[in-house]
Amino acid sequence: MSRYQPRIILNHPEKVVPDDIMEQFFLTIKTGDIDKIRNFVAQNKNKFNIIEKSSKPGGPNKTPIHAVLELDDRIADQETKLTIIKYLDKMGAPMDLPDSDNVWPIHLAAADQDEDIIDYMLKNKVSIDRKDSSNNTPLHYAVYGKQVPCFDKVKVGSIVPPQDIDKLPLNKTLTDTKDYIVELLNNNPQIKNNLIHTVNTIMNIPSMYQATKTEKDLETDIVDIFTEIASNPSYPSQNYANSMSVQQNKLDQLINRMYILINDDLLRGLTNPLKISPNNTGWGPVTPSSSGQPSSIDRILEREHDYVFNELNNKYSSARNTVIDINLASTNKLSRETIPNIMRNINTNYIDRLIFCPDCSNSEYGEKITLTKMLYLLVWSNYKLNYIPDLVRRIMDNMKIMSTPIHSQIVNSNYTAFPLNSNLLVDDDSSLIGYIFSNLLRNKLNPQSQIDLALANVMDQVDPTINAITGGINSCITNQLVPLFTNSDDPNGAVNLFDGVLNSPINNLWSIPEFRSLREDINDLRPAYRDGKISWFQMLFNLIQEIQPNLVTGNTNDVTNNIFIRGRRTPRYILPLTPLPNSTNYGPPPGPPHGTLNNAYTYSEAFRVMDALVQYITSGQINATRYPRVFDQNINDWIPFIDNEFQSDALLQQYPELTFLYKILAVHTQRAIYSVIFNCISILLRNLPVSPEADIVRNYLELIDDAYMYYLLLPSEPNPAEFTQTGTDDTLADLKQHKWDPDNDLVNWFTKYIQRIPTEFIEQLYQLIIQNIDDFNYGNLENIRNHIESSMGDLSNFITPIINNSEFRNSIKKYFGTFNYPASYNGTRIASMQVIPRFNSLIDDIDFEYRFDDYLTLLRNGAITGLTFLTEVYGYFFVDTKKRLQLIDESLVDINAIVADIIANINNETYYYIPQVILPALVKQLITVITNIYAIKDVLSKFTPVKVEFDSLITNSIPEHNQIINLGNDFVSYVQDQLKIIYTNTIDIIKYHNNVIEFLNTHSASQLINATNTATGNNITTTRVFNRNLIPIQIFPSTLSDNPNFTEIETVLRSYSIPEITYYADATDNTDILIDIFDIGSTLNLYHGTISFDRTGIISNSPNVTDNLQINIENDGTVKDIPDPIAGQWLSFDVNHPRGTSYFNAFIAYITRNFQFDKLNGMPSSVFKFLPEYLSFMKQQIIEQVVQFIVDNKDTNAKKIYDELTNLGTQTSYQAIPDVKNYIIIGKLTDDILNKLFEFAIRQSVSSWIYNITSNDPRYRSIIDPLNQTISIINKKDYLRLSLNQINRETISDLLSTNSPYVDYGLAQVETNPNNLSYTNYQNLNKFIYYLYNINYSSDNFQDGNCYYINPTIVSKLIDSYTLEAKNSDGNTPLHLAISMTNPDIVEILLKHGANPFTFRNIRNESPYDLFNDIIRSHLKYDTGNTVSKSIENFYKPFNDLLVSRLLDDKFKNNIIKNITYGIPIELIMYNHMFHLYLENYRYDFTIEMRDSIRRIFQKYFNITDTVYPTDLFEINRDEDLSKILESEFPQNRVKTSVQLLNPKLRDYQKQLAELNNQIINLTKEKRSTINSQQISFINNLIANLEARKSIVQTNISDLEFKQPTSTVDSAMISSFKSSVNSIQNRIGDRSLNLIDFYRLAFGRIGYSQDLYLNIWRLYLEKDILNARSMIFPLLDQVINNHVSLVKENKMTRENKMTRENKQELAVIVDFYSTVKKYIESKKSLPNNLDDNPILQEEHDHIVYLINLILTPTIRNILISQIYQGLAESDLTNTLIADRNVAIRDILNSEYNGHSLDSFIKDILPNLSVKYFTTIYGNQDPNKFITSASDVFQPIIETVKLNRIIQVSDDSILIQNLRDYVIPFFINTYQNFIHHIELSIYAYEKYILNTYQLTKILQIMSNLQIPK
């Protein structure tokens, strides 16, 4: 339904303004000058509400606001526009009128993207619902954005233009000068000595690599090369060459590789020319006129020769500071922050949550188990607290106070004291009085517990009298009850009831708990008796008065039984003075006054009164000696008996007061009996003897304390020994002392709460506790745990409601300290014990035992609950992991101490013990840390499969089960992540170790150089120096592997070794520091507790003969010289027992004397660290000496040379200062000579190195020539590995006839048919997809294409319910537009505001969702392909087509370099490889988490396992493919399609063969002429050796002679290639290599043929994309495509199948592309130079690599071919020389500006051409001043002109052809090649950026709920 949009006119336009004024007004507005606008209005007084008119119909009709908003930003910026708008608005200009296209100012403001202008309009109530003529709302405009110029950085040029550089013509003078310099080097003693010293130092280089990885790798390579030869039994033979062809190639590569390595590693820049020029900043010769100092212009070198010492001092200080100023963050932070934080997190988030769940509102995880344990403990605590009361209760439940026989005895004794003798009926079965206590415990209790019997046994120990009543403990109860139940006149002291509560007001009784149950009975009394203020005695007296128990027999009082009548007069029915007949107080006077009360009354007397009254009421009779019936009841049954007695008799019911009084008496008596029994037991317990029986009682009755609680709460199973410590060793003493006695708040609370617990449950728990009387011993607490765990399942019906009770749970939490009291809390408060902190502390201090198997068995058998199992098992798992982390922490603390020792030794200048003792200990401790890390990882990894064992036994429906399992899963993930961090930081310790080695080697080098520099002769002495280099340890595996990688560590430690090294100590070395570090003075045993000084390897005789310690110090501190070094491995390491690592063989000798060496023998190997600087210093010193010598010594030859140099040249630049020119030439020539000499020395050094290795290995003796010290294969070096394509046969024939080494230049180097060019659509050009250039990016960091600025804030402000869903004339909503702009931010904003991506459709019936699907699917199809080539062909083909079309130029006769179309596809592959490498090496904000996530995605979708470097480039599985690419390595294979190539060595070999034949013939003659057997034997050996050499030469000749080959690549060649590929994969461990370094290193291991390289690239292009794991972008796009297919929305089907895992994968991919986006955008945000923009530098390096791969070989051959043909066409050349190759060789060897033609084409030209054609240079690059492309290539012409054989002038045909045709062709080729490489990179990056934006939108869409 359409919405009517009325036009609202707020300000009517002015109608009467003159046209000219109106036109001028709008013109003034369009100036953007607010002052002019104001002045115009002031002058013309015009109105503001006018409309701009046009002479044409339907003019614009724009308001002034329109005019302002349409101003170009260059005329008025946004601030100016706003100022003008505000002014116009203030003056009345209409702000809400449309123009003729219905465009409103709000539309223009939205398009202008200025937030302030939008805010101003909205503030002025401008409607945002306006539509233009195409129905676009302002929101449409805002989403579309503002097109802006794409960003391009301003380039700053040089103010001063570049100056011309003079060029010196070279001629014979230079040759003479060079010869003179050579003579000077040979004859001048000082210069010669320095030169010999320098050369011999170079020759010592192999010794500098002794025992290093480099040497070991070299040995391995040699073994690989020679294995086949040495194992060949037929060697030497005629087939020798065939069997060695592969090895020959490998050895060639090896020699070259070692040469390159040494140059890069040790001799950086040594053989590079020095920058020698006038007005330099360094050294210059001293002349007679310079007054001892060179003038500024005479300074020809960049630096003074002694600059090196400042440089070395700085380097030394840097190395030292790196060690002593080390930031110990890697270890300190680990031990003080990282690991403690991890352990705290484990405590808080896992252990505490599992056990206590302190923050849970309800019981979760394992808290119910904790609450259950606390319940059991509290019940048992209650049992222990109440055992004595309970025992008393049971005694009173089972015993009468006295039996009838006992009562009779009392009566018969006239109620006097009991006779304590055998006459008493002992152990009367029914009487408490008179029963032996121990027998009572054994025989009378029901129920009876083990503790009762234990107590009985102890009683018998204390009082063995069990057959009579005595004074012992067994008679205690009888003895203490006697005073209660005897005559009040008892001389033993009867108890007097008058002294107790019975003689106080009855109301006082109610405060006593035992009486409270009788309180309500007072209401049943008759009113006269309800006065609670009278005493029990008074109420009894009153009752007797009422009853008047007058016992009369006939008319006579029954004196014997009537105890109530006193005297014989008027009866007074009173409380009798005594109930006992015949008492002295009974009868006639002189007794007490009639009617008074006696002051003594016993329990026995009271009961007899009560019984007498009952008798009287019921029968009217009294038997004064009758056994009271209540005594016939068990003591605790008295109250029920009395109730029953009175309730069953109507007569008694008349006197409820009697019942009431009787019950009070009964209760009072029960209390007295209870007190007696309790007191007797207490007496026993206070006096327990020392005996096992007594200990059992103690254990049982000892109160529970906090130690019990912690034992049970700790995960199973704490080591019981930890709880049985005593004295000062007892760390739990405070817990044991905190008893659960009545003063404990929790216990006190529970004594009340227990009354709410079912008695049945309590009784069952009591039965558990009494099953084994020894369970409560601290050493047996595990039994208590077992009781709890095994019973809680059966008792769950009782337990569950208790622990779910909030009062119970909160009370426990209060005790734990986890209850948060509300501010207004009025409930019970329980003192907090802060249980959790102490609990966590105990975890650290206590050992635990592994009980998983036991628990699993119990779970299977149903003996424990699943929750118990999970809580205990996971609790142990968490705790065990934490304790293992604690071990790591402790080890890191030791490492910190070791590092401190290193620093202390360095500061003390005590160097010997650092590598000898401390560094191996550091490595050992590192191994300990790694072992512990792997131990944790092993625990984590094993726990997952363990879960399978119990998974089926756990009920998933119980929430706590799932909570604990999920908590465990999270724990595993968390700890694994933390272990990676710990491991990574730990491995940094190796870097520190190697920094220390670096410093020690630097120190030795510094000592040597300083000594050499200060020495006056050739005998050099120094001290405190190692005579050889210490070897750093290889880096351990950089990432934490899934399995313990101890084998790799073992490999590292095997190489952790030294050669034989001696330390030369200073006799004044201060060794005081050693006393503290090594604890000297006590027995030398362990260093820092980490490693024993005992060695397990070769006997060191340290510190004394036959001793084998690693330390040369005796216990008294004496340092011993140990003269014999031991080479070998530092540490003995056992994979199965890594913690047992010990010192092994390596031992550095210690000698207290100076180190001496002869300077002429070169520097010792320990100069290694400063070798580059030192050799550069020596080189400059020699140059200085040569120049200075010639300046100072003008002998005849020198003067002649000097004069010739002075006259050399025709330019005038230096005519006024000819001496400077001479200095420069002499310096440059000397530099050139030294460079060549040093290069020769380096190669000789490498050859000697290889010879020494092979000569010392018996396996290679048969291929060694000991006379000439050469190796056969080295002598067989063949450099003619040439590639033949089409051939200029005439030229080739000419070349072959002269044995030219330059055959390749005769081959056709251009593609004669462009249709043959690969990777192009030249004959079928498809339309290029231009949207690559037109993607609408919000970023301003792009140079080309259309760039748009979109302000999300403005978009948000222009959204309302109408604009959000408004359609324009195309039916597109703002969301359609945002998607078409591929702007994820705007898409997200619109969706958050409620935009519907499914409902609204445009005129093409597309919803926004449809549109997005179409866009992303079309986009992803662009790089879809099943091969590498197919995945990128949509990029390289269009650009190759452009390249070819631009190269096909008539000016260059349509010549196109062969293989030039390989450049772009290879660059696109390299781009993929580059980001693969960035991801693997975490560059440009890539992280290990992102890398691991991408790896998991590739593993899931493609089953790809990534490697760090793109080694998939070299993985060729099919031998057929391998054979094809290897054919280029064999000249004979190329001969099949060309002509035979002859090696220039053929004639040399023929000469050698002739010489060998001559030697053999003459030696044979000599042998015939001698009879000396020894001489004959010697000659035979020589002949045999010569024959072997002859065989080799014949083989060489045979190889070089033309044959039609019968085979190409054999299996050995294929095997060799595969071996090389394996070598790449296995040996490239240096993570610092960039992509180009990797290619150079990897290709270098395979071969040196450019054809081979191209074939490898070609085969990779045809590789299945799934086998090209480094093609990261196409592979990721396949994954994205898969995810797109999971989210569908069309007319027929709507579904979203994307899982949570898919969404996580998509998030990873978006994050990856976001990081790539930042990289691409940063290219332009960084400075536009190679020094400050590493991205541009890498792009530069890529293009240089491609130039050298594709252009350089061909360009070189074209150039040489042109030179050759030019010489061939010259009659003068044919006349002067017979062999044109001599001229070519001379041209190639000629140097211009220090570079030969070859070095310029390969090393200079690629870099220079890329810089020039991209206009990107370094900051100080002088090449930036080159003004024409011809200047870039000019050195080629200049080099050709410099040859000494043929004078080539600028007018010669050769030079003209080069200048006019060849060089322009080169320029065109290089320029277009470079430009289109850059263009392809740019396009590919645009595609990647669009991929990011579309993928981000996909991520947003994936989270939408698609409506059904």
Swiss-Prot record:
Question: Coiled-coil region(s) at which residues?
Answer: 1539-1603
Keywords, sorted A to Z: ANK repeat, Coiled coil, Repeat, Virion
Which locations, inside or outside the cell, does it occupy? Virion
Q: Where is the signal peptide?
A: none
* GO cellular component terms listed in the entry, alphabetical order: virion component
Under the heading Pfam families, the entry gives: Ank, Ank_4
The UniProt entry annotates ANK repeats at 20-50, 60-97, 101-130, 134-167, 1370-1399
Q: Which InterPro entries match?
A: Ankyrin_rpt, Ankyrin_rpt-contain_sf
Query: Do you know which PROSITE patterns this protein is assigned to?
Result: ANK_REP_REGION, ANK_REPEAT
Q: Name the predominant localization.
A: virion
PANTHER family (UniProt xref): ANKYRIN REPEAT DOMAIN-CONTAINING PROTEIN 39-RELATED
Name assigned to this protein: Putative ankyrin repeat protein L484
Its ancestry begins with:
Viruses, Varidnaviria, Bamfordvirae, Nucleocytoviricota, Megaviricetes
